[in-house]
Amino acid sequence: MTPKKITGKILFFSDIDETLVNTDKSLSEENRAALEEFLARGNIFVISTGRALSGACNLLKRLGLYGKENLLVSSSNGAIVYDTYREKELLRRPVPRELMIEAFDLAREYPIFIQTYTDTSVVAEQDCESLQRYLALQQLPVEFCSNIRDAKIDPPPKLLCLDFFHPEKITQFRAFFQEKMRGRLDCFQSNPYLLEIVLPGVNKGTSLRFIAEQAGIPIDHTVSAGDAENDLSMILAAGIGCAMKNADDALKVKANYVTEHDNNHAGVAEILNRFCL
């Protein structure tokens, strides 16, 4: 049964890549118009992404969305919640330094490429072709260190393993990592080439519940939209969890609604118009 339109104040969580924006990272006029009308009615719109905060904010500035009232960013899969209008952090749940070091040791042992973050850049021990592709996509700078133990950085929001050329290696390392860490760190894939590593309990769903509670919005007045495995927690947490037409099949079977249009044809506007406007 298709959910009904919500009346009253609404919290909307949307993934960015392959959800809100087109594959070329542009924002359709249909999505822009629906999003602006949604905000004009006093609702809260959250960009919920695996991207690091600086990368997410850079994209929002390019799209002309940064700094709008009631537009928040939940970055690094929920590790940081940031108000772009007030330019203020509302939540930060970083990976402890000792666990970061242990994760780097495991990746080095395997071996697989791993990186972490400061508030403004990627931090890595070595260069590789996958890293350069990632930096170009995310438009982020990189800082290199000989060993992460010597890096003078704060506990990071997340770690990331990546391999754009051998995705099967990501899947294999995931099983190895989960066995070694035994619940001390969580990991999941945002796409076949990326393995996100965060503190247990950090995910898009817990971020949705946190913001809903802070804003005094009941869960049945929350909507989420996504396409990939790291979106599943917010699909399940929201009152109306929506999977894009282009989403993974595993996400579609768990969603309350699957869009008729994909991310390149204003699927988020479809959700906003059907349930929120």
What are the functions of these language-model segments?
Residues 29-131:
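Active-site phosphate-binding/coordination module
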Residues 2-11, 28, 196-277:
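Mg2+-dependent phosphoryl-transfer enzymes with acidic/Ser/Thr/Gly-rich catalytic loops
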Residues 106, 110-225:
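Conserved acidic, metal-coordinating active-site core of Asp-based
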Residues 69, 77, 181-183, 237-238, ...:
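Short, structured coil segments at secondary-structure junctions
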Residues 16, 50-51, 226-228:
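Active-site metal-binding loops of divalent metal-dependent hydrolases
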Residues 1-16, 33-40:
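Non-catalytic pre-domain segments flanking phosphatase-related domains
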Residues 23-27:
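Conserved ATPase-coupling elements of RecA-like P-loop NTPase cores
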